[in-house]
């Protein structure tokens, strides 16, 4: 689930768009060579391709990525290594949720408020807590670009299963499986509500032995069930806004037309999901010969790719 932060920096700092191509090809990590898929940025995020995240980390840089994560509300320890792009850091769910608030909130990050008010048994207000102060961390157009990219995850990628639930609103999000396959995540949102689900063991040393039990297969359906129940409950104030609002500056951009975006989000190398490919969500693996941080740093320096051309007004 950390990958969207890296992709955000590709948009804001390097000028990437959903149709920017990220190359695939052989990638050697920890003495093991895998065949990585390439494709458009929309395709790579939808499929959660590790090789693409690796290339983006080489472009953006580790320290800039950590700096941005801090701006988004992530206070957890982030090791200064490229492996954070592949799920190597332990980040609490609430911190990840706060970092995602900028996407549906048009670029504004909002700290969580755990209690909004206290009432007595008769419903009399005893105390009302102040509303969190939001701060802008990215522009509205960049936030909407990321919303579209993360809608691709739900429409064409690893979180397609949430579409089987009756949620009468547009959906976007990201699956995740942490390093060592100990946690399965899904963080998703509609225009009105952001929520996250986690599957794992209290003891982080106990892995989920099947990669089919990670974010895509276990966490995403739980999110879908929760959200469908929320929207079905007429006592709750959700369902008034069902579509993400497109900024005026992007309305004439052909990239965001539905059919065009569908074509962009499904444009990849289409490798078979074999053991030597990177169809493993955020998972780095836990086999003998895994990647070390020193090796990651060395490979990162060798695998840098050129930033995309800076965005011009005509791009938006």
Give the location of each predicted region:
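Active-site SXXK
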Residues: 1-22, 44, 99-103, 146, ...
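A penicillin-recognizing enzyme superfamily signal
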Residues: 46, 92-93, 97-98, 102-256, ...
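Gly/Ser-rich catalytic serine loop of serine hydrolases
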Residues: 1-2, 88-91, 215
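Mid-domain, small-residue-enriched loop/turn segments at the edges of structured enzyme/sensor domains
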Residues: 33-35, 61-100, 107, 111-114
